Amino acid sequence: MVDTESPICPLSPLEADDLESPLSEEFLQEMGNIQEISQSIGEESSGSFGFADYQYLGSCPGSEGSVITDTLSPASSPSSVSCPVIPASTDESPGSALNIECRICGDKASGYHYGVHACEGCKGFFRRTIRLKLVYDKCDRSCKIQKKNRNKCQYCRFHKCLSVGMSHNAIRFGRMPRSEKAKLKAEILTCEHDLKDSETADLKSLGKRIHEAYLKNFNMNKVKARVILAGKTSNNPPFVIHDMETLCMAEKTLVAKMVANGVEDKEAEVRFFHCCQCMSVETVTELTEFAKAIPGFANLDLNDQVTLLKYGVYEAIFTMLSSLMNKDGMLIAYGNGFITREFLKNLRKPFCDIMEPKFDFAMKFNALELDDSDISLFVAAIICCGDRPGLLNIGYIEKLQEGIVHVLKLHLQSNHPDDTFLFPKLLQKMVDLRQLVTEHAQLVQVIKKTESDAALHPLLQEIYRDMY
């Protein structure tokens, strides 16, 4: 006699995604019940296992005819139990309360049978094999026993039963003792905790790589800027530009290369606008290298890379520009110069409107007290934004941004534990930045139309084209 497959096949489970109806959850539950009934008929066709079966112990080799009711055999430790979710149910049934898998085939365990947690099918298979002293044809393939194929190789299935600790001497009555249930819950929680720790380690590694790329690719960062603005640098303090005379002096030294390209004879506002463009082009180059270092970005289609940078660079520039600003002015020329806010406000229109909105944003952004590790993740999330116009692989980019935003959230919780609303505040800044860039692009178009001497750099002209 052998344990053969039942002609009644279990129904294949349905995936939740296949059902869009709000009744899908209840429908799936009913299908699960039908599946369990079908399986029970197929696996247990030889008869039900009642109380009388628990009395039958004498035919097993080595049995002393006794019933073990309080101990587990060493091999039946639940150490290999996978990590299911522990529902907050008060039901004492092990299968429903802990959602434990069968140690043999991975199906849902119906209880604690023969020393291990097992499903009804594997419990019945083991009982029949022992009671009838069945001997199966030897198999050397070490078949993997799963729910879908557990009836195909009885030899390997029985060997799996023995290897996980099933024993006819380990029968016991009643519910799982509280002490064992607590132990099993603790084991499951430990497994879940270990899995969470592993995921956290991966996320921290991603955050570290992005932060390192940020420090590597940008000449100025917040740490350097704050030291200079606080007057704590060991080098000479920055040269202060507060009027036209000091501006001319700075143009001969600090930004000489920027004004040596045919704009020397232009008026001060035009020269200032030209210098702003030069600094923007340098930052775009740095941002491009930083983006390439973001894990997953280089795998994108080249067109998608260009699109993400086109729409993201100015949002990133104004974010990082905040680190160089305080309420009185901003650092320029890698921290060697400082131009006052008041001087910029006194430039003639429309040039006086260029920087003031950036100062307003910077004061609010700096109030969040972010450091470079926070800003690096924020800038990476800005660049990898899946809602930019014209993207091809939107799904991949959205997953890329989702991972970065998740790392950002965890990092903020760790780095700023007392500010529980910092993450939503930072997400709001993404919205503010889009508005800021839109207004800036509109102002640049006004300058381009009204100021004949204020030519746009070719790279920036390409970025602004069809931007907003």
From Swiss-Prot:
SMART domains: HOLI, ZnF_C4. A zinc finger (NR C4-type) spans 102-122, 139-161. The keyword Zinc applies. Keywords: Activator, Biological rhythms, DNA-binding, Lipid-binding, Metal-binding, Nucleus, Receptor, Transcription, Transcription regulation, Ubl conjugation, Zinc, Zinc-finger. It holds the Pfam family zf-C4. Residues 304-433 are annotated as: Required for heterodimerization with RXRA. GO terms for molecular function: DNA-binding transcription activator activity, RNA polymerase II-specific; DNA-binding transcription factor activity; DNA-binding transcription repressor activity, RNA polymerase II-specific; lipid binding; MDM2/MDM4 family protein binding; mitogen-activated protein kinase kinase kinase binding; NFAT protein binding; nuclear receptor activity. The keyword Cytoplasm does not apply. Ubiquitinated by E3 ubiquitin-protein ligase HUWE1; leading to proteasomal degradation. One of its GO terms (cellular component) is nucleoplasm. The record marks 433 as: Essential for heterodimerization with RXRA. Ligand-activated transcription factor. Key regulator of lipid metabolism. Activated by the endogenous ligand 1-palmitoyl-2-oleoyl-sn-glycerol-3-phosphocholine (16:0/18:1-GPC). Activated by oleylethanolamide, a naturally occurring lipid that regulates satiety. Receptor for peroxisome proliferators such as hypolipidemic drugs and fatty acids. Regulates the peroxisomal beta-oxidation pathway of fatty acids. Functions as a transcription activator for the ACOX1 and P450 genes. Transactivation activity requires heterodimerization with RXRA and is antagonized by NR2C2. It is linked to Peroxisome proliferators are a diverse group of chemicals that include hypolipidaemic drugs, herbicides and industrial plasticisers. Administration of these chemicals to rodents results in the dramatic proliferation of hepatic peroxisomes as well as liver hyperplasia. This is Peroxisome proliferator-activated receptor alpha. It comes from Mus musculus (Mouse).
